[in-house]
């Protein structure tokens, strides 16, 4: 038996929790072309370890995308301001998990970034899941009833989901990030709960071979 180091100050309430892995896949912001469909794969980009007490606001902040930090303007003569970034011009998003659309109603950013924003010039956040829900209502023979909830007050332990089943985060209108949960287990003292969410891996900078379009280029 190997000796393992156990933290001395771990609250019993912390141990009475769960740990689950969140896998976020490569985003797609366009309809794949025929040559792309042949090699289309759901490629994991990031893996995070979450605890049951992790809030959906914290989980929402883990979705990073280059589309958020672009600016749809002529930058030759004008230096983009923070409010010019797509993240703030088109801030609406949602996460669809099981049968529920989780829709943010407020900006969840750092106080430093918030202090630089003129809220009177900000694009108001809207429920971009509404057109999808209306479309689903027309196809009741194919879809069951769905719910809509704000992400405030929701924790990972409150979610109803299936391990390994794909869910989706949508932002910028049509940019989709497929994600799923795996490796659910009970927490133990060796998990060091103060560091959650934990980044387990990041392969977002790896590029596929241009020939096979499947394996990582060497």
What is the predicted role of each segment?
Residues 1-218:
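Short linear regulatory motifs enriched in tryptophan with gly/pro/ser
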């Amino acid at each position: 038996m190997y000796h393992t180091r156990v933290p001395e100050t771990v609250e019993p309430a912390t141990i009475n929790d769960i740990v689950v892995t969140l896998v976020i896949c490569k985003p797609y912001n366009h309809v794949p072309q025929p040559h792309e469909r042949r090699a289309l794969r759901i490629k994991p980009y990031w893996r995070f370890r979450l605890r049951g007490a992790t809030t959906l606001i914290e989980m929402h902040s883990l979705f990073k995308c280059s589309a958020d930090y672009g600016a749809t303007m002529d930058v030759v003569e004008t230096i983009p301001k923070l409010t010019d970034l797509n993240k703030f011009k088109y801030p609406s998003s949602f996460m669809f998990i099981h049968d529920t659309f989780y829709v943010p109603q407020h900006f969840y950013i750092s106080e430093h970034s918030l202090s630089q924003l003129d809220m009177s010039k900000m694009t108001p956040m809207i429920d971009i899941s509404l057109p999808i829900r209306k479309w689903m209502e027309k196809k009741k023979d194919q879809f069951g009833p769905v719910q809509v909830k704000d992400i405030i007050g929701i924790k990972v332990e409150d979610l109803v989901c299936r391990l390994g089943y794909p869910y989706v985060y949508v932002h910028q209108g049509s940019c989709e990030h497929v994600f799923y949960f795996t490796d659910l287990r009970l927490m133990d003292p060796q998990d060091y709960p103060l560091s959650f969410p934990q980044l387990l891996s990041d392969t977002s900078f790896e590029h596929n071979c241009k020939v096979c379009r499947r394996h990582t280029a060497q």
